[in-house]
UniProtKB/Swiss-Prot annotation:
<keyword id="KW-0158">Chromosome</keyword>
<protein>
    <recommendedName>
        <fullName>Ubiquitin carboxyl-terminal hydrolase 11</fullName>
        <ecNumber>3.4.19.12</ecNumber>
    </recommendedName>
</protein>
<keyword id="KW-0788">Thiol protease</keyword>
<dbReference type="GO" id="GO:0005654">
    <property type="term" value="C:nucleoplasm"/>
</dbReference>
<keyword id="KW-0539">Nucleus</keyword>
<dbReference type="InterPro" id="IPR018200">
    <property type="entry name" value="USP_CS"/>
</dbReference>
<comment type="function">
    <text>Protease that can remove conjugated ubiquitin from target proteins and polyubiquitin chains. Inhibits the degradation of target proteins by the proteasome. Cleaves preferentially 'Lys-6' and 'Lys-63'-linked ubiquitin chains. Has lower activity with 'Lys-11' and 'Lys-33'-linked ubiquitin chains, and extremely low activity with 'Lys-27', 'Lys-29' and 'Lys-48'-linked ubiquitin chains (in vitro). Plays a role in the regulation of pathways leading to NF-kappa-B activation. Plays a role in the regulation of DNA repair after double-stranded DNA breaks.</text>
</comment>
<dbReference type="InterPro" id="IPR006615">
    <property type="entry name" value="Pept_C19_DUSP"/>
</dbReference>
<dbReference type="GO" id="GO:0005694">
    <property type="term" value="C:chromosome"/>
</dbReference>
<feature type="region of interest" description="Disordered">
    <location>
        <begin position="1"/>
        <end position="29"/>
    </location>
</feature>
<feature type="region of interest" description="Disordered">
    <location>
        <begin position="593"/>
        <end position="668"/>
    </location>
</feature>
<feature type="domain" description="USP">
    <location>
        <begin position="257"/>
        <end position="889"/>
    </location>
</feature>
<comment type="similarity">
    <text>Belongs to the peptidase C19 family.</text>
</comment>
<feature type="active site" description="Nucleophile">
    <location>
        <position position="266"/>
    </location>
</feature>
<keyword id="KW-0963">Cytoplasm</keyword>
<feature type="domain" description="DUSP">
    <location>
        <begin position="28"/>
        <end position="133"/>
    </location>
</feature>
<dbReference type="GO" id="GO:0005634">
    <property type="term" value="C:nucleus"/>
</dbReference>
Amino acid sequence: MAAVAADPAAAAVPASAEDRDTQPEAMPDLDEQWRQIGNGRERPLRAGESWFLVEKHWYKQWEVYVKGGDQDASTFPGCINNAGLFEDQISWHLRERLLEGDDYVLLPAPAWNYMVSWYGLMDGQPPIERKVIELPGIRKVEVYPLELLLVQHSDMETALTIQFSYTDSVELVLQTAREQFLVEPQEDTRLWTKNSEGSLDRLCNTQITLLDACLETGQLVIMETRNKDGTWPSAQLCGMNNIPDEDEDFQGQPGICGLTNLGNTCFMNSALQCLSNVPQLTEYFLNNRYLEELNFRNPLGMKGELAEAYADLVKQTWSGYHRSIVPNVFKNKVGHFASQFLGYQQHDSQELLSFLLDGLHEDLNRVKKKEYVELCNGAGRPDLEVAQEAWQNHKRRNDSVIVDTFHGLFKSTLVCPDCGNVSVTFDPFCYLSVPLPVCSRRVLEVFFVPMDPRRKPEQHRVVVPKKGNISDLCVALSTHTSVAPDKMIVADVFSHRFYKLYQLEDPLSGILDRDDIFVYEVTGRIEPVEGSRDDIVVPVYLRERTPSRDYNNSYYGLILFGHPLLVSVPRDRFSWEGLYNILMYRLSRYVTKPTSDEDDGDEKVDEDEDEDVEDDSSSEEEKEEMSAPTVNDGTREAEQEQAGTSSGVTERCPSLLDNSLRASQWPPRRRRKQLFTLQTVNSNGTSDRTTSPEEMQTQPYIAMDWEPDMKRRYYDEVEAEGYVKHDCVGYMLKKSPVQLKECIKLFTTVETLEKENPWYCSSCKQHQLATKKLDLWMLPEVLIIHLKRFSFSKISREKLDTLVQFPIRDLDFSEFVIKPKNESSPDLYKYDLIAVSNHYGGMRDGHYTTFACNKDSGQWHYFDDNSVSPVNENQIESKAAYVLFYQRQDVGRRQSQTSSSDTPASPVSSSTPNSDIMDIN
């Protein structure tokens, strides 16, 4: 769809206020726009309807515009631009791993049509239309349809890429293949799929959906046509079976089996390998004890289907007959019952583990009919009595191998801050999610721009408090630069313009590591007061005129370039000519002044114009004062910054409407050659020709407009981009390792509830921000410890790569369990490590692997999808450790005694650890 833009130079200049006067369809007022789009987004999903993707950044800009209530505001978003959602502008394929809310928003067709009619769509960009599909228990917009490669058995080299919905049937794929390959109606055909192991599987049931058939994007689908003699070509084709050739005669160690990555399913493989190496749970499935306890009628379960799928997976991995298996059937079952795991996006191994443990518990719950149980209230009774009652009540509704193996008991203590009322409850848990001690400091990389134009910008790395303000950044930078903190202003520069001008009280949490932060040296007051004699701060952009191809080079657009400036102008020199001279001085390091010959050769003034030009007969002293700002102690006092928002300072700034600027004109009436012209613009750098300076209700921005020839002759781009690195650039914040027990201790410390989650005090009869403390009362046979490496806040997300040191053996919990020691054995507190789920990478991408100890051999192995290799114990501890599995020592001893009487397991492979694979820190 072609762009609908009001301004002929829309491709060269960002949309400005005047653009809206020539839109193809009259816009409703902003409140009506907000109402129509808001109502559309609240529309419920209906299967088969079309929804459209809109790039999040453009949509947020639109929200700022309509919420501002000013239809002529500088925040006008321009044409809809979805460029950030595409891999390229040739195939227009959608980028992978886009997330709703982070990268895009969804609009129903009516709302999308409104948006396009009001703002237009960027030239050449196709609309991103997606359909709503009906899945088990949920409707969702299918942002990533299934892409299959269709080939004929007779021509395996020519593949067609066709998109299908996951809810389409296999029959539709067959019919599409017949149409694409021009198969005659009377000819018989059938389909095969090639899996990641290279083997071919027949798609027998054509009535099932592609989701149920476990097909995935990029998978090869082969259509074969029956021969004229009635035979099928597959009789002669090698590999038309379900068993990979490499596994036909394989015999290996049970449990040493990889899992094929189906496409971003390493998180699932990691969780499965950890759980598969929990000895008592695996024996439970291998010995078919689960068959007697399958609960097909539990409304909270999956009718036994999840347990059966997991049992099949365990039996295959522990058969010893496979180097690796393809867990597509299990993946399909998980997606069928938990829509969040549908498709092939990356997920969290701990989240899948939580779902799997809960699902297996409900599928294997021995309680067929759950009775109503009242919550256990302490009411001043002894903890031992209340805890025993709470555990019995839990077992009356929840009794399974999962409870036997993984469930423990918390003691939760809440104290009202007003009346001192204490509430004690005992709650079951399946795993511990323990926090990591967080460093209170962070390192920010910034560019310091000194006032002296002879000095290049300096790159600095400064250590600041994580919860500090912009003023803390200025103080830290002051120690490197010897410039007072009150003579600095911090700005976020993006795409050659000021994205945000920070105030001193703004929090540092608003600065992301990827932001380009510039700190400008200034003088005087940051916020001039009307009537004061402080300098006036003017944001300045650099723009270059470029001819527009659409108008045979007769129309010029303007493109921003270089780094923006914040220039302080003395009030007595606040005129166009004074500003020009100050800018020439500020840019003197990389802008060359024209010589006298160039001035004379380029200056041609018409006689009529001469009559209007004042005689340039000022004294040499006056000219010197005009062309070179004064310098005191090597620095210029005429520079001052003013902080604001990304759309400029929102309050009226009287100092910028000084009468001297109103009365002055551009260009100045003098003969000296001008390298650039000046004009007021909005915060986006777009010319606002309809508004004069005296009419500006917000702080004006100034643009320096360069002709291409003048820029080429006098502007040194290499020098302009130059900077120096301060000695502090090499500084790295050292992170000391923490002990696992520190995390557990932090988990059991007293905390105050957040405002979003208050507690209702039965004594005060109102919600209170009570203090809460969790203590460990009873520990399970297998303790799962989840290290909370992912930190979330309202404006940022990060992964903590702190090294957590954890013991392989003899992890003693006796200091954390508060149950009276005379009521339990000391052996119930010591644990040995049996598995670790690792995560490498960042927040939105990464890779999961597993370390696990084989229950039969005691040998540790490294599982990386379908690759498995033995490792030494000293290789297990790393910054990637994410979920730890510990087994109680008394349970391990019982299993060792049992296994010693059984038939010995197959010997461990004699291969040695692969150092190349394990060198991953």
